[in-house]
Structures are given as structure tokens and as C-alpha cells.
């Protein structure tokens, strides 16, 4: 069944074509933008007509008035709703019965597919996120990165895109060598198993130990780390390479456990140790072609004046590469591995300069697909105590944060005496913790810095993940009651009749359900899940008002009770679909 808003797009496009000047191109339904009026008194849906002013050589208000007048001449239009011109907008008061029937039928039929669109069908989108170092566990900053990358991947896929998720593991460099030196000096042959410590935490403890060592012996410690890196790059010290592989293995094993815990996955892992030499040949080709230039000391540079920046070194005077060089090579390799229409890098805003230069250099090298590269920049995430630091060992580890949230959630379950109802209380508490974490991280627009408040995130009331989970469990409980002998008795003669849904709370809930596909599109277009988190909160509030105002099983009218139960069922479907897109575990019981 066609969406009622899509029907109105077609109606308005046809009407515009009927009154357009002969010089105008044919107007297509998808050219008609859709908005929601600021208050219900102005209608249920608004269609701005600004974009047609130039081709019509008329004001948007005049166009809206003419379209409205033409529509009101057609009595058949009224079955879809009543149009009204309000300034440059054509607003529509939708026919409640038809909308209710349309929405319920569509949601109940499409189920987990409700809200999916084909707007990105045929698009191949690669997205890079997380990018951990193998000298320490994931921290709170990674959690924001991971949540953004995974959520946006799911949203883009929901809109029809073929999405390929990649992760570059930073497994080489001086910082990796520092953990290795500490293990050689202080590890005493210990392992994560022997110390009963999560493997990435064990490696991170070595990094902290090196920092303490370097404070006591600064010049010696740094010299040792640099020498170890040279020895590693030479590749001849088998014992050193063995230690590197062992410690990287520990770190990656632990990091993967955290990914599993938070619902994060990838289609391909890249390793810096395999990519760091890439790109040098491309820089030399660019030098030969005159795209880059060489200084007297032999270093190779690019002039960034065309993008209003200074200049950037691409190869050092000794011929060694930089991060920029390897990122150039890695980007080229990825496009060969999996030709994409767009490549999204989810990386903090401190790297904005880096990506401006990277995209420009690739374009200068003749790669047209450089226009399809996008840096999804996001802000710093802090705790109330202040910024995170890693080398001193005062960083907020991802696992520690989740564990503390889980402990608090478990306390609440026990305080409310819900251990028996939720089944495995520890699993339920972890689901609440992950939901609280992801909702809090994703409700803020990526570009903004944010303060993560663990206590606020766990609240079961207000704009939080646990509140959404509670609402899902509440609806599930209502639906279970319908399956009891008493519920079946009350509903046995009932039939679905959407025209009975005339209460204002029912109407608002239906309109909110109908709005879900539009919110998915908005989040995909902006690459910003915060529109969906805001939508989830509005949906939960709309259901709460409906449940308060409209008795489901206590009514005398069997058809009305049955229809309201189906409205609750539809709400659960949309809630589940939306929560999945923003990584919040749905809970049948809380």
C-alpha cells in the first residue's frame, strides 16, 4: 500500500504540471519536499513550494494558493485529506480513517522491513570506523566512534545501500614498541591468563608501565623505543617479531570481545603493519608528473594553496613515509578491493586538516573517486571528571565503563525485585547498560563535543535508553496479556477497524508511526543518528499518552479493543526497528 504522503506528492506534482508555464520541465513527485507543520492546527503535513518560484515566475505563496484552489475543485481529493494554502506552503489535514488504515496495514504487513527505503539502492558505501591501537583497550572515545560507525552503517543499509564496514588496526609504530619494551623489562613471562586479566587490558598495563619507566629515564626510554621500531622494520629479529605478534594478538583478542559486547562488527580488518609502506610509489609518480615538488633536502611536498592551506610534506628527506603517505596508498588499495560510490571515514574532528589534504592529494593524483570521500567528523567526549588520558593509565576504559553501568543496572533490577521476571539478571543488566551507553552517545549530533554522564544515562525516566527499553517491555507485556485466556475472550469477536481510532492520542501515535521512514531518510542524508534517537523518544511519549487515554482491554467494544491492540503491536514493531538502528537492545521484559 502506498504511503499517504507519497500519494500527496503525486497529487501535488500532477497539479503543478497542470498549471505550470509551457517552458517548465515536467515536475516529478520526488521533487516535492515534505515537512511537518510546527503545530497541529496548521495541518498534518506541509509541502513547501519555494523551489518552483523561479520556473513559474511567481511567488511561492501564489503557487500554493493556485494549487490549493485547483485541488478543492476536485471532490475526489477529499478522501485523501483537506489541503490548505498557508503562505508558501501547501498544508494538508489528512483523512484520519484512511491514514490510520494505511499506517496500520503497512506496519503490520512489512514488520521488520517497515521504514526501509530504496533511496540508496545501487550505492556501494564503504565506511571506516574504530581504528584502535594495539597497545591499550578501547576507551570512551572509541565507544562514540564505534556507535556512530555501526549506527550509520545500519541506517544506510536500511535505505538500500550496499555497505562495507572496514577497520584499520594501528598495530605498528613507536607507541606499540613502548608496550613491548615494558613487557621485556617488567612482564616476567606473565600472560593475561596467568594474571586473570582481559588480554587488551594486560597489554594496556604494559603501556602504562612504560610511561612510568620513561618518567624516570626519559632519554633512555625514548631511544629504546625508537631503536626497537627500527629493528622491527628491519624484520630480522625473530624474537622481536614473535613478541610483537604475541602482544598484538592479545590486544586484538580483547578488543574483539568488547566489539561483541557492544554489537559492533566489520566486514574487513586492515592492519597498519601491512599498509604503512603503501603510497610511496604514488608520491613519486606525482612528483614525476609535476603534481608535487622536491625541496633541496630531498623531501617531497604538495602545495595546498588551491584549498587555501599552506603546504604539506609527503615524503621525508630520507625517503621514509608519513601517515598521509600510507593513507593515500590504503585508500587506493581499498577502492581496488571493493570499488565504492562513497567512502566515509568516521574520525574525530582533530583530524579535519588531515582529511582535507588527503582528499586533495588523491584528486591531484588523478583519482576521480576522491570526490566521493567523506570525513564524518565528530567531537570530543568527556566524563564529568574531565578529559581522558591514556598513557598515564587514567583513561576510562570501555569495559570499565560498561561494567560500572551494568553493576548499577543490576542494582536497580534487584531493588525492584525483578530478578525472576528478567531471567538472567546479569544479561538483562548488560543490555540496559549497552542501551544506556549507545543512546546517550548517539543523541548528540556528531559534530558537537559531549559530556557523558553515566548516572543520567541509566535513568528509567526521561530521554534515555532505559526509558525506551522500558516502553518496549511495557508494550510486550500488554501484547502478552492479549494472549491470556482473559485477553483472548475479550478480543475473540474483534476485527481491525482503523476508522474507530478517533481519539487525539491515537491520532498522534499513528502520525508518529507514519513518520518513521522520513526520519530514517533524514538520518541517512545527514549521516547523523540523533534524528532517530529524538524520534524514538517522541514515539515512546506518544505511546505513553495513548496508553493513558485509551483503555485497550477494558473497553466494551471488541472491535475498538482489537484495533487498539494492533496499534500497540505496530508501535512495538517500529520501536524495535528504530532501536536496532541506534544499537539499543530491545527487551521483552524489564
From Swiss-Prot:
Cited SUPFAM superfamilies: Anticodon-binding domain of a subclass of class I aminoacyl-tRNA synthetases, Arginyl-tRNA synthetase (ArgRS), N-terminal 'additional' domain, Nucleotidylyl transferase
EC assignment: 6.1.1.19
Reactions the enzyme catalyzes: tRNA(Arg) + L-arginine + ATP = L-arginyl-tRNA(Arg) + AMP + diphosphate
Protein location: Cytoplasm
CDD domains: ArgRS_core
GO CC annotations on file: cytoplasm
GO molecular function, one term: arginine-tRNA ligase activity
Any one GO BP annotation for this protein: arginyl-tRNA aminoacylation
Primary localization class, coarse: cytoplasm
Motif ('HIGH' region): 132-142
Assembly behavior: Monomer.
Protein name: Arginine--tRNA ligase
Organism: Treponema denticola (strain ATCC 35405 / DSM 14222 / CIP 103919 / JCM 8153 / KCTC 15104)
Gene name per UniProt: argS
Amino acid at each position: 500500500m502506498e504511503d499517504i504522503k507519497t500519494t500527496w506528492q503525486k497529487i501535488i506534482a500532477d497539479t503543478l504540471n497542470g498549471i505550470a508555464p509551457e517552458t517548465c520541465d515536467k515536475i516529478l513527485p520526488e521533487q516535492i519536499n515534505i515537512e511537518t507543520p510546527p503545530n497541529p492546527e496548521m495541518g498534518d503535513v506541509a509541502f513547501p513550494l519555494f523551489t518552483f518560484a523561479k520556473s513559474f515566475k511567481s511567488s511561492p505563496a501564489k503557487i500554493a494558493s493556485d494549487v490549493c484552489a485547483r485541488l478543492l475543485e476536485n471532490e475526489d481529493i477529499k478522501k485523501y485529506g483537506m489541503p490548505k494554502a498557508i503562505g508558501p506552503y501547501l498544508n494538508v489535514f489528512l483523512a484520519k480513517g484512511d491514514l490510520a488504515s494505511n499506517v496500520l496495514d503497512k506496519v503490520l504487513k512489512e514488520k521488520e522491513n517497515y521504514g526501509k527505503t530504496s533511496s540508496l539502492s545501487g550505492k556501494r558505501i564503504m565506511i571506516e570506523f574504530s581504528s584502535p591501537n594495539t597497545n591499550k583497550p578501547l576507551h570512551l572515545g572509541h565507544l562514540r566512534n564505534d556507535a556512530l560507525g555501526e549506527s550509520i552503517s545500519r541506517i544506510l543499509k536500511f535505505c538500500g545501500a550496499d555497505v562495507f564496514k572496514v577497520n584499520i588496526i594501528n598495530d605498528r609504530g613507536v607507541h606499540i614498541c613502548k608496550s613491548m619494551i615494558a613487557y621485556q623489562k617488567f612482564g616476567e613471562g606473565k600472560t593475561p591468563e596467568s594474571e586473570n586479566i582481559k588480554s587488551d587490558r594486560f597489554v594496556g598495563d604494559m603501556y602504562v608501565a612504560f610511561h612510568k619507566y620513561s618518567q624516570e629515564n626519559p632519554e633512555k626510554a625514548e631511544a629504546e623505543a625508537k631503536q626497537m621500531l627500527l629493528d622491527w622494520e628491519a624484520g630480522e629479529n625473530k624474537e622481536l617479531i614473535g613478541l610483537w605478534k604475541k602482544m598484538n594478538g592479545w590486544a586484538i583478542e580483547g578488543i574483539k570481545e568488547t566489539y561483541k559486547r557492544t554489537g559492533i562488527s566489520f566486514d574487513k580488518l586492515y592492519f597498519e603493519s601491512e599498509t604503512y609502506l603503501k603510497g610511496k610509489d604514488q608520491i613519486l609518480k606525482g612528483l614525476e608528473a609535476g603534481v608535487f615538488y622536491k625541496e633541496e633536502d630531498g623531501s617531497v611536498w604538495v602545495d595546498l594553496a588551491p584549498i587555501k592551506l599552506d603546504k604539506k610534506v609527503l615524503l621525508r628527506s630520507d625517503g621514509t613515509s608519513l601517515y598521509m603517505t600510507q593513507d593515500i596508498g590504503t585508500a587506493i588499495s581499498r577502492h581496488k578491493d571493493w570499488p565504492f560510490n562513497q567512502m566515509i571515514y568516521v574520525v574525530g574532528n582533530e583530524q579535519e586538516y588531515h582529511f582535507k589534504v588527503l582528499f586533495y592529494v588523491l584528486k591531484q593524483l588523478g583519482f576521480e573517486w576522491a570526490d566521493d570521500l567523506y570525513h564524518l567528523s565528530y567531537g570530543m567526549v568527556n566524563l564529568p571528571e574531565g578529559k581522558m588520558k591514556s598513557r598515564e593509565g587514567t583513561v576510562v576504559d570501555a569495559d570499565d565503563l560498561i561494567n560500572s553501568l551494568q553493576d548499577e543496572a543490576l542494582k536497580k533490577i534487584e531493588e525492584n525485585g525483578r530478578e525472576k521476571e528478567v531471567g538472567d539478571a546479569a544479561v538483562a543488566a548488560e543490555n540496559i547498560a549497552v542501551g544506556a551507553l549507545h543512546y546517550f552517545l548517539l543523541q548528540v549530533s556528531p559534530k558537537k563535543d559531549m559530556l557523558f554522564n553515566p548516572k543520567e544515562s541509566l535513568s528509567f525516566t526521561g530521554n534515555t535508553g532505559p526509558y525506551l527499553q522500558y516502553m518496549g517491555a511495557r508494550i510486550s507485556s500488554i501484547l502478552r496479556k492479549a494472549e491470556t485466556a482473559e485477553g483472548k475472550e475479550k478480543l475473540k469477536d474483534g476485527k481491525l477497524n482503523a476508522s474507530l481510532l478517533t481519539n487525539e492520542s491515537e491520532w498522534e501515535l499513528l502520525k508518529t508511526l507514519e513518520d518513521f521512514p522520513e526520519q530514517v531518510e533524514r538520518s541517512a542524508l545527514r549521516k547523523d543518528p540523533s534524528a532517530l534517537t529524538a524520534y524514538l523518544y517522541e514515539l515512546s511519549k506518544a505511546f505513553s499518552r495513548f496508553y493513558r487515554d485509551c483503555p485497550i482491554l477494558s473497553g466494551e467494544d471488541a472491535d475498538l479493543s482489537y484495533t487498539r491492540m494492533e496499534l500497540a503491536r505496530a508501535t512495538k514493531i517500529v520501536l524495535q526497528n528504530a532501536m536496532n538502528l541506534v544499537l539499543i537492545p530491545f527487551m521483552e521484559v524489564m
